[in-house]
Amino acid sequence: ENLAKIAAMIGQTDNSRPAAAGLPRLAIEQQNETSEGDVLPKGSFRLRMGDQSIYAKELEVRLFVRYYSYDLWNNANPELSIRTVLAPSLSDDFPDTSGGNKCGKLSKDEVANLSSNSIEHAKQKSIKCTQVVYGVVTSADGSKTIDGEDVDVKGTPFVWSARGSAFMPVANHIREVPSNKIMFGQKAKVTTKRNVNG
């Protein structure tokens, strides 16, 4: 056992995770249940680490960096979906995988001039802007697996694609960081709140 640890420490063996594993992904659980019928805590934060998901109602995090991206998802053929590069400002150029910019996203004024029942108007509504945020969990009281097993996720790095109802709260938090402070030095408590539409 000690020999194996020493071999790993000096680089003799490669104990790294597979490259495809990537960073754990933070999201807000949108589903009510799994495909097997297990109940999921909809509205809780989900931290997907490999093939395991950990849930928490509230997290404390430090956000290190925020980028923006656009995508136009193709449900029929996901491999034909269009995505842009990541950029730190909405005023930056966003070259996309189709050779265009911002997946073809028009300005608000241009969209307002489109007929509401046109194909282009429908396409514009399908182009989504996402904030891609990299951070680390500083505390997560009550974080558990779906089976109720307690898991300590303190110190876990994550990537969070904040879009939809999560977009503005993240943007507002970053905007409110005082100009004499750096975002990654600030801890933030993040919670979810159920909104009823309609």
Located regions from the model:
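Extended serine/threonine-enriched, polar tracts that run as long, contiguous segments within proteins
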Residues: 129-198
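OB-fold ssDNA-binding interfaces and closely related basic DNA-contact patches used
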Residues: 1-151, 196-197
